Each structure stands twice: as C-alpha cells, then as structure tokens.
Amino acid sequence: LHPRVRRQRQMCIRDSVRPNMIFAVAFDYSPLDRAQKKQVLDIATKELLTPKGLRTLSPKSGGYNPNYVGPQIQRDYAYHQGTAWPWLMGFYMEAYLRIYKMSGLSFIERQLIGLEDELTIHCISSLPELFDGNPPFKGRGAVSFAMNVAEVLRILKLLSKYY
C-alpha cells in the first residue's frame, strides 16, 4: 500500500477502522506483505473484535453507534456504525490462523466460546443476525441468521485440519 493511503498514527487503511480490511488478510491472495497483514490483524483485534463478532466500525471512529435499537431509521444507521456481525468472525479467525498458525488455535477456540453460548439463547442451534457492539452484546435483528451459522461451521471445519 502506498504510504499516503495509511494513517500515520495507527498505520491503517484510510480514515476509519472497519472490518472490510480483514479480508485482505484472510484470503489466499493479498496485496499486503506479512508485516502489513499483522498490523491489520492487530488493529482489528484491538478495535473491532468482540466476543460475538467484529464491529462494523471502531469505537474510536466518529459516528460510532453500537446499539441496534429504536425506530427503523435509527436501527439502519447503527447497522453499519458499530454493531457486531458474527459472520465476520469467520474471516477474522481465518486471518488469525494465517498469521499465527498452530500457536493461534487456543485463541480461536476461546473466541468461539462467545458464539457457542448463544446457540441456545435465541433460536436453538442458531445465531441472531447481529449483536450490539458494546457489553452486554445483546443479540438483535433476526433470531436466526444462516450466514452466521455457516461461518461458525466453516471455522470448525478449518480447525479440524489442525487436529
């Protein structure tokens, strides 16, 4: 990445921290070198990671709204401004394993616990559409969201390759 594209203070892409950046680390082919991938992962871990998924916007960014509540227009705004999406956790975990390999397994397993706990709360063996971006990370939106369940299953399959 060209230096002028990076924020000097945090060394991240453009001016807000969003989960899109994790795809550049998770995919097989990336324009980033290993050091850049680790920087992206470190920022995502520090600013976006929750026990229920990745936030759609860092709490340090302007316009952060972690609570999916209120009238439809207010919920629509919060949807991309700080709520946590479980399906993004799959790509985050894949990125984490690309950087840390076997030494990252215990961390990934601990992260899955936050999602595993939810499988009996809203809809048996399913996960809600999203969670509030701040504690207590309340499940919101659709009570059962296939994309979230699919990503957890994909990560479990990926983890099985290590055992």
Q: Whereabouts are the PLM-identified features?
A:
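Single conserved hydrophobic/aromatic residue that forms the stacking wall/gate
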Residues: L1-I13
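Short, solvent-exposed loop/turn segments at the edges of secondary structure
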Residues: R6, V17-I22, W87-L88
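Non-catalytic carbohydrate-binding regions of carbohydrate-active enzymes
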Residues: R7-Q10, L32-V152, L159-Y163
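His/Glu-based metal-binding/catalytic segments typifying zinc-dependent metallopeptidases
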Residues: R14-R34
